[in-house]
Amino acid sequence: MFEYDPKKSICTCARVTYGDMAEAVEKGARTVADIREKTRATAFCGSCTERVEKFLTALQTGEAKAVVQAEEPVSESEIVAPGFRQVCEDIYYVGASDRAADRFEKQYPVPRGMSFNSYLLLDRQTVLFDTVDQSVREVFLRNLETLLGERRLDFLVIHHMEPDHAATIAEVLRRWPKCQAICTPGAKKMLGQFFGPQLAKRAQEIRDGVSMLTGKHVLSFHNAPMVHWPEVMVTYDRTSETLFSADAFGTFGALDGNLFADQVNLSDWMDEDRRYYTNIVGKYGGPVQQLLQKASQMSIRRICPLHGPIWRQDLGVILDKYRKWSTYTPEEKSVVIAYASIYGNTELACQALAGILSDKGVRDVKLMDLSREHPSYVIAEAFRRSHLVLASVTYNGGLFPDMEHFIHQMKHHGLKNRTVALMENGSWAPVAARKMDELLTGTENHVLGKKITLLSTLKRSQLQELEELADAILSSMK
């Protein structure tokens, strides 16, 4: 006999329980394909396929028996208080932070975790702006249910379909069956791709610039394609002068109680703002410029992004950064020296160059070891500064892999308008400078003609060459 708990998950990806599957069989499902169509079980990673097959056989042969585990009643006084926060009149934060996260998008280190923001408007009609990542699903749903109470959820505005914001859409629409989703045509197509055609039917496509009255509040919807996916839009609440900005103006890091940007050490957060922008959105400067142009026509008192703190003061600070970043304009005239060194000889030459640059008046020179630093940090520093020195050993007749990877990252994230100097090392047949120059072709960066070639180590006789390279860098800063 196959004993099962109807409330237990059989497919965690699609959040399908044994009870859901048993119900699907009662309604005529006969094959695994039928189960997939009706419940989405097995449609994602496939690890549940064997369980589904065994349970399906047990149901069809009459050998399945439901065994409901008794649950102790929990009084409301024992339930942990939700983490919703008021943003302004009628608008609440209902998101949450995942402090256990160590990588964002499986690649970017987030040592301080990650926040996944969602907002609820309580007007005559209720509006939820985006959902959250699966990692914070339970806290988000508690926040939402507590704030709504007996009220229904009327609308779900979907700004962006990336799963860190869209993973719980199906759950929200299941819990509030009369809720209507609002999104761009591109987002509706993705709804069908992620969750199936039936759920996509719950979405109303919205045109660019269309407005909606929810009671006191007037919402207008504005397309923001490629910031940083094609289906993205933002929402402007004319009544509270709030911009719900999707991924724009977001950052890495969990929220540690301080919900607003004016409550945190901004210099600490700005480094992560920059790293977030340059690595997530950096390639799409043109689309960001278009969004900034739209935003300039709005009277904005606060910006509510999908990651990081809410901006309600000094909005000019982050807007100015976005203008620079999206036009690939350096924030400061300075130098980052990114090097790939195996035994330390190339690193020593870079340290010597850094000292010479400092003596000549260049402030805040940054040395970064590509074998130790994650590329996202180096990309952020390269966006920040006007000049970049790339120094690499020759390896297997080409570039050291970490340097090659970094230059590909530069190209991938669209870094341009920088002045680049090259240094190479090789005990025989050094070719690293030529390989770097070839990779940089077409990147809209200016490569200085002066290059340094080391033969195993930096010689005293080459210090003059470093002086000349430093002078060339200084001259190009004017």
For each feature predicted by the language model, list its residue ranges.
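Conserved beta-strand hairpin/beta-sheet module of binuclear metal-dependent hydrolase folds
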Residues: 84-145, 234-237, 242-245, 346
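FMN-binding flavodoxin-like domain, especially the glycine-rich phosphate-binding loop
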Residues: 83, 255, 265-303, 307-310, ...
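Metallo-beta-lactamase
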Residues: 75, 79, 85-89, 183-232, ...
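Active-site neighborhood of phospho(di)ester-bond hydrolases with catalytic His/Asp-centered motifs
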Residues: 129-131, 153-161, 181-184, 243-247, ...
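Local cysteine-cluster metal-coordination motifs and their immediate loop/turn environment
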Residues: 6-21, 37-57
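Active-site-proximal loop/helix segment associated with metal-binding centers of metalloenzymes
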Residues: 228-232, 248-282, 326-331
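Active-site metal-binding motif and surrounding structural segment of the metallo-beta-lactamase
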Residues: 124, 135-182
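Divalent metal-coordination and catalytic microenvironments
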Residues: 90, 121, 160-162, 235, ...
